[in-house]
Amino acid sequence: LENIRQVDAIVHVVRAFDDDNITHVSGKIDPIDDIETINLELGLSDLEAVNKRLAKVERAAKGSDKEAKAELAVLQKIKPILEAGGAVRTIDFDEEEMKIVKGLFLLTSKPVLYVANIAEDDMADPEDSKYFGLIKDYAAKEGAEAIAVAAEAEEEIAQLDDDEKQDFLEAEGVEEPGLNRLIRASYHLLGLQTFFTAGGKETRAWTFKTGTKAPQAAGIIHSDFERGFIRAEVMAFADLDQFESEAAVKEAGKLRVEGKDYVMEDGDIVEFRFNV
């Protein structure tokens, strides 16, 4: 478990299919029991870490160490939740408390995405899976998201060329590979979005945190872009898809000129103007 303390989020894959040829360690298919077993292990590991930290911080907090006192208060807020089988991510923290929580690297403080590993027969409509609904309901109770992916089919899809892949998806009655949905859900979980730049024959995708303003997004490409930022010329990917060329987007009045306070949106296609 120590290997995942440094990660930003957890993707929890849960079996959600029946197959007599694939045995389950408990002899039955019960995704909620599987989830709770793992969550219990994570919670117990966190409780052990909190108790160890408490022993150190309590001594320091007896003096005039304000940081120790603040951390002690957070640890005392966390401990009873873990003892009751809860997750740290379900606790409301203010901004200062959250800084302390992040420094503790607790496993149950991390956002989680539940992935139901469904049968190939359920790909077209995951809601038909008798297990997926249970997983979604469980996730909703803790404010998490759940998606369905047929892992065995995804493995097969990954080995196909583009034409074969499209034929496979059409035969299964699905629009896109589950991997695409997994990537989007993971981006959403981490608060990440994408903008694009295009020049000559090269088009690049850049990842940014939701809420990033144009100058800071420009700085992802190069620090000079942020330092000398003048403006951003922006078109939405949906508009380019509709009008099919940059010239047509401009003619339709869909090309926008944005300043330093512009908050970037997912799918923006941008040309940054700068001077240094």
Question: What residue ranges belong to the model's regions?
Answer:
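Short, exposed interaction patches on small structured surface elements
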Residues: 13-49, 143-157
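Switch II of P-loop NTPase G domains
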Residues: 1-12, 16-36, 93-104, 128-131
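Charged, amphipathic alpha-helical oligomerization/scaffolding segments
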Residues: 6, 49, 74-77
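C-terminal-of-GTPase-core extension/linker across diverse P-loop GTPases
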Residues: 56-265, 270-276
